UniProtKB/Swiss-Prot annotation:
SMART domains: AAA (SM00382). Belongs to the RecA family. Residues 377-386 have a biased composition (Low complexity). It is found in: Cytoplasm. Residues 358-407 are annotated as: Disordered. ATP binds at G79, P80, E81, S82, S83, G84, K85, T86. Keywords: ATP-binding, Cytoplasm, DNA damage, DNA recombination, DNA repair, DNA-binding, Nucleotide-binding, SOS response. One of its GO terms (cellular component) is cytosol. This is Protein RecA. GO terms for biological process: DNA recombination; DNA repair; SOS response.
Length: 407
């Protein structure tokens, strides 16, 4: 068939000729830029299933819509002081390490507590840590780690502490307008493509600042300009709701509200209210109980909780205590919840650090019904005092001064 000319570009008059022209263009592109530079979506492994790193909180996994933090993407966690931002990031590090991943922590604030990280389940002896002097150094280290292709998760704590070299070399009181914003914008442009190829999850922790002269609307904003807002696939806001205590007792935790402000992987603006226990992080058993009730795997009638028609406790604290004391049943419930929420994901328990030798391959039918009844009776008569979470700390860790690997 004949072709009409539009300038110097031939316009094909049939579908077959268009496809031939497109194939010739594809071959030329691949010759110039390499194999896989142009492909059809859904073919030639152009798009694979989204790989994730669980958050350590099954309720937050559900709110994110895909079961955790997506690999190969940039995540921003922000909020007021002492709201739980670093706790969220350390839980993600622990979950990545459980799955055999390599984690790095860029401590720009020079404030990471190894003991607290250990208590949250982080293998401190396997964690790579850097405490850079300048923001440029921190971001160059992050880029080098991403380019290596060997690191699964990197945490930068925090954006506000990425002090530009010009500011460090200057005097106190000197005005340095927009230096962090320019630094972040340049770094993120370089990092975006290599992060996706390396399947590394890069988490930026950020602080809040107040805008000057704002009369209407929310005066709060995050540091580092707006580049991070654009490049982040997921933005998570963490805020403290209340301090957890009973009467005159000493406070033992915080209740926090986690809101998904931006989500390119699933619908955004979902909210989760959860507990963070001092020195222990997420109340994992409480989160599992709430998720199981929501998915109707555990039945709640009045104050009683029941699993497979067997009562496991009267009141929330007693039901949580039952889960802590019966890890076989806890893993059954966790498997059922995760299978229902994320059927395509392989099951790896978030509780394996509590009982490392436990086999995760046992079917739900293999649990001992007598154990269920016996432990349920204990749970029903247990005291209603607050149930403490089981510690995940390993007693055989080395001294803190020698465990962290310095870059």
């Amino acid at each position: 068939m004949s072709k009409a000319l539009k300038g110097d570009v031939p316009v094909s008059s049939s579908f077959e000729e268009k496809m031939k022209a497109l194939e010739a263009a594809r071959l030329q592109i691949e010759k110039q830029f390499g194999q896989g530079s142009l492909m059809k979506l859904g073919k030639d492994d152009a798009v694979q299933g989204v790989e994730v790193i669980p958050t350590g909180n099954i309720l937050l996994d559900e709110a994110l819509g895909i079961g955790g933090y997506p690999r190969g993407r940039i995540i921003e966690i922000f909020g007021p002081e002492s709201s739980g931002k670093t706790t969220l990031a350390l839980h993600a590090v622990a979950e990545a390490q459980k799955r055999g991943g390599i984690a790095a922590f860029i401590d720009a604030e020079h404030a990471l507590d190894p003991q607290y990280a250990k208590d949250l389940g982080v293998s401190v002896g396997d964690l790579w840590i850097s405490q850079p002097d300048t923001g440029e150094q921190a971001l160059e280290i992050a880029e080098s780690l991403v380019r290596s292709g060997a690191v699964d998760i990197i945490v930068v704590d925090s954006v506000a502490a990425l002090t530009p070299q010009a500011e460090i070399q200057g005097d106190m009181g000197d005005a340095h307008v927009g230096l962090i914003a320019r630094l972040m914008s340049q770094a993120l442009r370089k990092l975006t493509s290599i992060i996706n190829k390396s399947k590394c999850t890069l988490i930026f922790i950020n602080q809040l600042r107040m805008k000057i002269g704002i009369m209407f609307g929310n005066p709060e904003t995050t540091t580092g300009g707006i580049a991070l807002k654009f490049y982040s696939s997921v933005r998570i806001e963490v805020r403290k709701v209340e301090t957890l205590s009973r009467g005159d007792e000493e406070a033992w935790g915080n209740k926090v509200r986690i809101r998904i402000v931006k989500n390119k992987m699933a619908p955004p603006f979902r909210k989760v209210e959860t507990e963070i226990l001092f020195g222990k992080g997420f109340s994992a058993f409480s989160c599992l109980l709430d998720a199981a009730v929501k998915q109707e795997i555990i039945e709640k009638k009045g104050a009683w909780y029941a699993y497979r028609e067997e009562k496991i406790g009267q009141g929330r604290d007693n039901a949580v205590g039952f889960l802590q004391q019966n890890m076989d049943i806890t893993l059954e419930i966790e498997r059922a919840v995760r299978t229902k929420l994320f059927p395509k994901q392989a099951f790896i328990s978030s509780f394996q650090e509590h009982r490392p030798a436990l086999s995760l391959e046992a079917s739900p039918e293999e649990s001992d019904a007598k154990t269920l009844r016996r432990x349920a009776s204990r749970g029903a008569g247990a005291s209603s005092s607050r149930v403490q979470e089981g510690s995940a700390a390993n007693d055989h860790f080395q001294d803190e001064s020698t465990t962290a690997k310095l870059l």
